[in-house]
């Protein structure tokens, strides 16, 4: 069971692979803990699949937490809008902290200040991102574990949370850009059965007690890794932006200009600029989508992917081999763009419904995609450009951890410039802004804490008001559902109740979801992305308080099925578990921003 979630990663995989092994923690030996966890698993292996939630906790999860070094207190209440909510475990660094916390059980804020993390446990291999209705092994019915852990983190104010079904372990961070959709998952059983100590070391380092303990600087191991990941993303983003402005854009645009120039024919600089911008963002989009597994990199698509092409180019560059003056790479890319646009059943690629890769309607010679079909770039130009976009300091760039601040700022910055053609025949061009400056200016970024403050104080009052209206509607929906259970009602009465119920459900969906956010000067979209993340997390808290007969949860289930049916109509099979409600909800919110 290899975990392939489509969530945004909590840490940079590049940082974990290349920087973490240089840390003091990496030099520690995980083998004693590995042997204890493996012995625990082997002793219970034949029973685990038949155990309910409480039994799974007793036989496997509690012993595992103890092996990982935690002291814990089970089920301490936290209030969510007046509703009692209980994270399964409050985790402590040592027995002394646990003992001190016992005396503060009735003082929620004081109690949770002593907690290093919370944990939520489910029965063995229970799906962690979906409602499991009418499952006898669940203690609480109609709950979504990923909704629960996000709500508990926000409700308690604890920064770190563990969600597990015994096999899959997820790490959540309250201060992530989106508490619900960013997490770090690991398959413990796969690690134990493979006897791969190097991979197990990641699990041990990130889920043991010591990972949550603050050092003399007030930061724990997880926070240091998170900061290191963010620093890496910032450095890569700055390098990419510098390369795009100083080399890449001019090399691409100059290549187009040199190819289309004919005696007596003027070259339209604005069209070359727009086509180059479109081409560049197709490449960045694919690097990002492939790194995030938004395209099926685990299937035959990989051999056709941009990442694979970039790896082949890197090998040739490192071996100092020559590239052709023909257009082999460009033609491969155009075919790849068309595959993304039209889909390819045999490769497991669905149709992309955006306009970025759509060529069929680009009949006008003034459209960028028509331009890209009409002209080409040689391998000698494209190969080094792709390599610069693909590698940083000799290693593949971790595009999965880059965000709107890094990639969006490139696009935002380019919009301030125009293309100047110095010599059309040789393809000499440069970028210049309205002031005549050639060098990319330093863009001003609103600090994250200010963005979060503005978004929160703008949207929170609206959500608070909407939730009160939603609460009233949910009360009416609950009453109608109870009335419909009366077997003595006539068919006419039942039909009338069903019609009224449908109206109330639509109203409830509209109340919570019809919140439109507009940023007229959006730039890179930083504010809108924060608004989407904020709304998603807040809506998850609200939905978690109403797990029964919830019309929005019902709508998300219908949306999932609609996507699955649409893909099947294209001949593409998709594991439904990959369409998590958190991501579907985020998609709904995004469409309104």
For the regions a language model picked out, list residue spans one by one:
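Core residues of folded domains in eukaryotic genome-function proteins
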Residues: 115-117, 160, 511-513, 591-592
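Short acidic/His/Gly/Ser-rich catalytic and metal-binding motifs that mark active-site loops
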Residues: 126-130, 419-423, 540
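Flexible phosphate/Mg2+-sensing switch loops adjacent to catalytic phosphate-binding sites
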Residues: 73-79, 145, 179-184, 299-306, ...
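Preference for the N-terminal adenyl/adenosyl cofactor-binding alpha/beta module
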Residues: 1-50, 139, 167, 183-537
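A short, conserved, highly charged catalytic patch centered on acidic carboxylates
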Residues: 1-160, 175-181, 220-229, 234-238
């Amino acid at each position: 069971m290899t975990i392939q979630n489509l969530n945004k990663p909590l840490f940079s995989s590049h940082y974990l692979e290349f920087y973490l092994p240089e840390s003091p923690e990496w030099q520690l030996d995980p083998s004693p803990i590995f042997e204890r966890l493996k012995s625990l698993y082997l002793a219970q292996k034949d029973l685990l699949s038949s155990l309910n939630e409480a039994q799974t906790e007793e036989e496997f999860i509690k012993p595992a937490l103890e092996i990982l070094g935690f002291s814990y207190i089970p089920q301490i209440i936290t209030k969510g809008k007046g509703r009692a909510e209980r994270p399964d475990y409050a985790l402590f660094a040592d027995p002394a902290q646990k003992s001190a916390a016992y005396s503060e059980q009735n003082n929620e804020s004081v109690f949770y200040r002593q907690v290093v993390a919370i944990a939520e446990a489910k029965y063995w291999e229970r799906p962690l991102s979906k409602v499991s209705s009418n499952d006898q092994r669940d203690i609480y019915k109609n709950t979504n574990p990923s909704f629960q852990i996000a709500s508990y983190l926000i409700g308690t104010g604890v920064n770190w949370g563990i969600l597990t079904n015994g096999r899959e372990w997820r790490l959540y961070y309250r201060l992530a850009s989106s508490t619900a959709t960013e997490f770090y998952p690991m398959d413990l059983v796969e690690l134990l059965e493979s006897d791969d100590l190097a991979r197990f070391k990641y699990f041990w380092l990130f889920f043991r007690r010591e990972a949550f303990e603050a050092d003399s600087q007030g930061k724990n191991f997880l926070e240091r890794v998170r900061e290191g990941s963010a620093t890496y993303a910032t450095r890569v983003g700055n390098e990419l932006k510098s390369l795009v402005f100083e080399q890449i854009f001019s090399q691409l645009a100059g290549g187009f200009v040199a190819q289309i120039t004919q005696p007596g024919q003027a070259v339209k600089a604005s069209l070359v600029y727009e086509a180059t911008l479109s081409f560049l963002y197709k490449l960045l989009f694919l690097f990002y989508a492939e790194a995030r597994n938004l395209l099926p990199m685990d299937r035959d698509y990989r051999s056709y992917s941009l990442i694979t092409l970039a790896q082949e180019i890197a090998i040739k560059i490192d071996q100092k081999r020559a590239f052709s003056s023909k257009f082999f790479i460009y033609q491969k890319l155009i075919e790849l763009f068309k595959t993304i646009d039209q889909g390819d059943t045999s490769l497991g690629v669905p149709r992309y419904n955006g306009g970025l890769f759509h060529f069929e309607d680009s009949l006008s010679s003034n459209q960028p995609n028509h331009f890209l079909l009409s002209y080409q770039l040689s391998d000698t130009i494209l190969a080094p450009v792709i390599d610069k976009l693909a590698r940083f300091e000799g290693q593949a760039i971790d595009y999965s951890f880059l965000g709107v601040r890094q990639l969006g700022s490139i696009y935002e910055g380019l919009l301030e410039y125009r293309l100047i053609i110095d010599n059309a025949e040789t393809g000499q061009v440069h970028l210049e802004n309205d002031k005549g400056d050639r060098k990319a200016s330093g863009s001003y970024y609103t600090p994250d804490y200010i963005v979060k403050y503005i978004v929160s104080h703008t949207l929170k009052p609206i959500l608070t008001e909407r939730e009160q209206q939603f609460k009233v509607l949910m009360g009416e929906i609950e009453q109608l559902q109870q009335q419909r259970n009366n077997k003595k009602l006539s068919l006419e009465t039942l039909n009338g109740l069903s019609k009224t119920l449908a109206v109330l459900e639509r109203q409830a969906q509209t109340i919570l979801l019809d919140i439109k956010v507009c940023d007229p000067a959006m730039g890179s979209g930083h504010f809108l992305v924060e608004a989407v993340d904020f709304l998603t997390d807040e809506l998850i808290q609200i939905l978690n308080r109403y797990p029964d007969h919830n019309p929005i949860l019902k709508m998300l289930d219908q949306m999932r099925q609609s996507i699955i049916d649409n893909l099947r109509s294209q001949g593409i099979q998709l594991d439904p578990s990959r369409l998590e409600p958190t991501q579907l909800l985020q998609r709904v919110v995004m469409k309104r921003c």
